[in-house]
Curated annotation (Swiss-Prot):
Pfam family, one: GTP_EFTU
InterPro entries assigned: EF-G-like_DII, EFG_II, EFG_III, EFG_III/V, EFG_IV, EFG_V, EFG_V-like, G_TR_CS
Record-linked PROSITE patterns: G_TR_1 (PS00301), G_TR_2 (PS51722)
Family: Belongs to the TRAFAC class translation factor GTPase superfamily. Classic translation factor GTPase family. EF-G/EF-2 subfamily.
tr-type G domain segment(s): 8-282
Protein name: Elongation factor G
Keyword ATP-binding among UniProt keywords: no
GO molecular function: GTP binding; GTPase activity; translation elongation factor activity
BP GO terms, sorted: ribosome disassembly
Residue positions binding GTP: 17-24, 81-85, 135-138
């Protein structure tokens, strides 16, 4: 089958926002207008098409990023709906990794909110062009120009309106197009009947002022337009649109649109803007990767003629077809039934069926082309972030960074029958979600799960119950502490045992130094002259890695330490891998005496919004929880406080805030960094852990 839409006519976009900005409703409307749905599902009725997991429909939030294909103005638009809740950051990250452009949805009453900042920062890291849709213009307190100002103040974004609203709240009835300088008036509830009229007289001055600002802002990004603008020449609508497109694709400019997805206003114009201003796969730089055979950097331009290269960005378990692997094709063509090489794992995989997804229904296709997003059935070894390529043209594409989990829970099956099922369920859930870890405590035999937040683990335990029919008891959430060294030291590990026959002998000198935050453990072999034979070096590293899994102070994993093996000795007969492993772990214990070991705790960036009169309470809450205030701003009658607070102090805070503010306060928190715990707290943690043992 030939290609249905050319690469120029393909758009891969994500819809990203703060929780509750109306993102899923916006996606619903896109699917409605592009002819994919016959009846609109409302999120607050629990009937949304994209939110297809049972829990999402109950909670009214989007958890998994379903990928959907739609058509608009003879273009194919692949849409990835991303969650707005901070506990699901990895979902946002992995969808950003495979997108070409994004629509950032704002709530017009609140403007830029905490999670908007997080996803905006991630999109900037990945260099994703964006347009902004100020949604909920029908809501009480909606303020379009305030929303635009928050883009400047909180994100330092070069964002400018290309539309203005006509009316707001209940009176929101149309949109002014600042490029055509026309008004689009809505005459029915479904938003399908639109009258294009001249701009109403009372809005004309404002429209001319913002048109002028728009032209100037776009001209600043383009030398030719700047010359025309300065010489007072007329810039045509076509030139203005071309200038906006170029600057948006170069991530120098962000067009801002307005509307109300719930009231069916502004969504079609936003779809037009997706086509007009967001890039096709041809507009973005060719993807780079490493050839695993030569270690040389290679590129794969978006073209069907190039060898096949794709990135797996999501694994899902589907009740009907089993394991689904969502992937983005960067170059080449793939037929169902063919073989590909997973270059990340060095494994050959057979592509069973290829499906194009529409929320939770699917269409089987024979061929997938460059620039497309699809799901494959039948891949056994592929996980999130793996590269799939032509067997004759290997390349490893840049993977997806996975943040470390910050919270853990103990889970135990309720019955023997649940025990076996729980193992399988947890393994499948961990395959789908790289930020979800499952470990067994060797000493107690307990299963410990860890993730990005309480909601994250709640949802996973819930899925275990619903999808895998496993009943489990869940312990109270615990903080994932880490340990590290704060000073450099040298230490000897010496192990010798003689018990008749062959003995054991291992002797090492290791220099330990603190490593940069986030660098993890690094091992360096600096042995000269074979004082420790080469075959025992891996055993020394392994001994350190295994010992560091249970740190020296309270048994938490050790991070950010460099170890340099620089001296030692061996015995011709008695030395063995085991002896050197034990010697390395003894060196680590010895180093702990002088390397200033410290316990680290996750610090959360907490954003608390409260009525003015509760500001004093909130400041007290932050101080009492060992937090430090980072900034404050007023918004209407509310105060927004940003603070860094240890996760350990935030359990149960929702209840405290609710009673202090009579239910009017809200807060969001997102993991920010690890930090040393104060000495007094460290002693408590050590005492508690020793007591438990």
């Amino acid at each position: 089958m030939a290609r249905e839409f050319s690469l120029e006519k393909t758009r891969n976009i994500g819809i990203m926002a703060h929780v509750d900005a109306g993102k899923t409703t916006t996606t619903e409307r896109i699917l409605y207008y592009t002819g994919k749905i016959h009846k609109i599902g409302e999120t607050h009725e629990g009937a949304s098409q994209m939110d297809w997991m049972e829990q999402e429909q109950e909670r009214g939030i989007t958890i998994t990023s379903a990928a959907t294909t739609a058509q608009w103005n003879n273009h194919r638009v692949n849409i990835i709906d991303t969650p707005g809740h901070v506990d699901f950051t990895i979902e946002v990250q992995r969808s950003l990794r495979v997108l070409d452009g994004a629509v950032t949805v704002l709530d017009s009453q609140s403007g830029v909110e905490p999670q908007t900042e997080t996803v905006w920062r991630q999109a900037t890291e990945y260099g994703v062009p964006r347009i902004v849709f100020a949604n909920k213009m029908d809501k009480i307190g909606a303020d379009f120009l305030y929303s635009v100002s928050t883009l400047h103040d909180r994100l330092q974004a070069n964002a400018h309106p290309i539309q203005l609203p006509i009316g707001s709240e209940d009176d929101f009835r149309g949109i002014i197009d600042l490029i055509k300088m026309k008004a689009e008036i809505y005459t029915n509830d479904l938003g399908t009947d639109i009258l294009e009229e001249d701009i109403p007289a009372e809005y004309l001055d404002q429209a001319q002022e913002y048109r002028e600002k728009l032209v100037e802002a776009v001209a600043e990004t383009d030398e030719e337009l700047m010359m025309k603008y300065l010489e007072g020449e007329e810039i045509t609508n076509e030139e203005l649109k071309a200038g906006i497109r170029k600057a948006t694709i170069n991530v120098e400019f962000f067009p801002v649109l307005c509307g109300s997805a719930f009231k069916n206003k502004g969504v079609q114009l936003m779809l037009d803007a997706v086509i007009d201003y967001l890039p096709s796969p041809l507009d973005i730089p060719a993807i780079k990767g490493i050839n695993p055979d030569t270690d040389a950097e290679e590129t794969r331009p978006a073209s069907d003629e190039e060898p096949f290269a794709a990135l797996a960005f999501k694994i899902m378990t589907d009740p009907f077809v089993g394991r689904l692997t969502f992937f983005r094709v960067y170059s080449g063509v793939l037929q169902s039934g063919s073989y590909v090489l997973n270059t990340s794992k060095g494994k050959r995989e057979r592509i069973g069926r290829i499906l194009q997804m529409h929320a939770n229904s699917r269409q089987e296709i024979e061929t997938v082309y460059s620039g497309d997003i699809a799901a494959a059935v039948g891949l056994k070894d592929t996980t999130t972030g793996d590269s799939l390529t032509d067997e004759k043209a290997k390349i490893i594409l840049e993977s997806i960074n996975v943040p470390e989990p910050v919270i853990q829970l103990m889970v135990e099956p309720k019955s023997k029958a649940d025990q076996d099922k729980m193992g399988i369920a947890l393994q499948k859930l961990a395959e789908e979600d790289p930020t979800f870890r499952v470990e067994t405590n060797v000493e107690t035999g307990e299963t410990v799960i860890s993730g990005m937040g309480e909601l994250h683990l709640d949802v996973l335990v819930d899925r275990m119950r619903r999808e895998f029919k496993v009943e489990a008891n869940v312990g109270a959430p615990q903080v994932s502490y880490r340990e590290t060294f704060r000073a450099s030291t040298q230490a000897r590990g010496f192990f010798k045992r003689q018990s008749g026959g062959k003995g054991q002998f291992g002797d090492v000198w290791i220099e330990f130094t603190p490593n940069e935050e986030g660098k993890g453990f690094e091992f360096e072999n600096a042995i000269v002259g074979g004082v420790v034979p080469r075959e025992f070096i891996p055993a020394v590293e392994k001994g350190l890695v295994e010992s560091m899994a249970n740190g020296v102070l309270a048994g938490y994993p050790m991070v950010d330490v460099k170890a340099k093996l620089y001296d030692g000795s061996y015995h011709d007969v008695d030395s063995s891998e085991t002896a050197f492993k034990i010697a390395a772990s003894l060196a680590l214990k010895e180093a702990a005496k002088s390397a200033q070991p410290a316990i680290l705790e996750p610090m959360m960036l907490v954003t608390i919004t409260v009525p003015e009169e509760n500001l004093g309470d909130v400041m007290g809450h932050v101080t009492a929880r060992r937090g430090r205030v980072d900034g404050m701003e007023a918004h209407g009658n509310s105060q927004i406080v940003r603070a860094y607070v240890p996760l350990a102090e935030m359990f149960g805070y929702a209840t405290v805030l609710r009673s202090a503010s009579q239910g009017r306060g809200t807060f969001m928190m997102v993991f920010d960094h690890y930090e040393d715990v104060p000495k007094s707290v460290q002693e408590e943690i050590i005492k508690k852990n020793k007591g438990e043992d």
